[in-house]
Amino acid sequence: MSPEDSSTASVSRAPVPEGTISVAVGLFVNGISTYIFFKIGQQALGQDGFKPIVTMWFIAFALVPGFFLPIEQETSRALAHRRALGQGGLPIIKRIIPLAAVILGGLLIALALAARSATDNLFETNSAVTLALLFMLLTYAPMHIARGLSSGQGKFSNYALIIGLDGTIRVGV
C-alpha cells in the first residue's frame, strides 16, 4: 500500500462502525428498563408473588432467541448481501415471514397443549402468566423480523429504537 493509500484509508475510517452508538444506546435503555421491570415487579408483588413472572421470563428468553434470533440474523445477513449487490430484499422477506409464522405457530400449539401443565407446575396456577408467555411469543417473533430488516438495510437507528422500546414497553405494561 502506498503512503497516499494508507493516509486516505485512515482519514475515511470512522472511529466506530456505523450504528454502534445508536445500538449501544438502545441496549443501555433495554438493560436499564429490564432492571426497573424486575425491581418494580418484585416490590409490587413481593419475591414469592413475582416468582411466576421470573419463571416466565426465563422460559421466554430461552425460547425466543433460540427460535427467532437465527431468523433475525439470517434476514439481516441476506438483506445486507443483496443490498451490497444492488438487489432488492423482497425475495428474502417473502421467505422469512412464512418461516417465522410456521415456527411461531408450532410454539403456540406446543404452549396451548402444555398450558395447563405449565400453569400448574411452572406458574403457580396463575393462568395470566401463561397468557403473558403466549403474548410474548406473539410480539417477539415480528420484533426479531423487524430487527433483521432494520439491520440488514443498515438502518441501525431503527434497530436501536426497537431494542430500546422492547425494554420501556415492558416496564409500562
Task: Enumerate the language-model features and the residues they cover.
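Membrane-interface alpha-helices at helix entry/exit sites of multi-pass transporters
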Residues: 52, 85-99
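Hydrophobic alpha-helical interface/terminus motif in multipass membrane transporters
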Residues: 41, 75-79, 118-119, 150
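A helix-boundary/kink motif common to multi-pass secondary transporters
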Residues: 45-49, 80, 84, 155
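Short, Lys/Arg-rich, polar N-terminal cytosolic tail immediately upstream
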Residues: 1-17
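Helix-loop junctions and terminal segments of transmembrane helices
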Residues: 68-84, 152
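Hydrophobic transmembrane helix module of multi-pass membrane transport proteins
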Residues: 2-4, 100-173
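Hydrophobic alpha-helix/TM-entry signal in multi-pass membrane transporters
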Residues: 15-23, 57, 96, 129, ...
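Signature of the first transmembrane helix
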Residues: 14-72, 112, 136
